[in-house]
């Protein structure tokens, strides 16, 4: 790949929109992105329509330019393979519910000791700390909680979701900006 990130290796442990949008931007900027998906499950968005030749156009648009590997990070053999790739990585991006990667031995506290130059980007709806951190978040939930849905739609109607998943797209964009700023810093 060409581009300003051509020498950067990104491990993509993301699903649906926020994380894949971030890593799509990094790939578009030239990074080599390896998407890690659970075997037989994959990214949830593989099931989102519309479909072209039995493939999700949604999934393909967000994961263009990426390589893909199926690994079960709960399995000891797959963990070894992941760790071999991790040794070469510059960036890891994840958007699991907080605490998930810690359970598998790949949380920030574990990895920063082994890989002090690794940039570890976590995108979650309610952050990594605080009272709501355990809640799953989708764009529509955050639009509602943030009040955005109350100012869209028709007068005297129910709250209406903004047509585009603006919260997820914006969060993915800001995560990509954060990764790029971290690359400059190291």
Language model segments and positions:
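N-terminal helix-loop segment corresponding to the beta1-alpha1 unit
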Residues: 1-183
């Amino acid at each position: 790949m060409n581009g300003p990130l051509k020498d950067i290796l990104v491990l993509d442990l993301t699903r649906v929109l926020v994380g894949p949008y971030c890593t799509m931007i990094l790939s578009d900027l030239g990074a080599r992105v390896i998407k890690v998906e659970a075997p037989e499950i994959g990214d949830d968005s593989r099931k989102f329509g519309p479909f072209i030749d039995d493939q999700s156009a949604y999934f393909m648009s967000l994961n263009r330019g990426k390589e893909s590997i199926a690994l079960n990070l709960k399995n000891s053999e797959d963990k070894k393979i992941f760790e071999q790739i991790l040794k070469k990585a510059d960036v890891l991006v994840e958007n699991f519910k907080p605490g998930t990667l810690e359970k598998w031995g790949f949380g920030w506290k574990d990895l920063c000791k082994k890989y002090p130059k690794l940039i570890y980007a976590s995108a979650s709806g309610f952050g990594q700390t605080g009272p709501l951190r355990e809640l799953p978040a989708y764009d529509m939930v955050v639009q509602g909680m943030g009040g955005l849905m109350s100012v869209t739609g028709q007068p005297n109607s129910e709250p209406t979701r903004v047509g585009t998943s603006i919260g997820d797209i914006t969060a993915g964009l800001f995560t990509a900006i954060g990764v790029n700023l971290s690359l400059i810093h190291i």
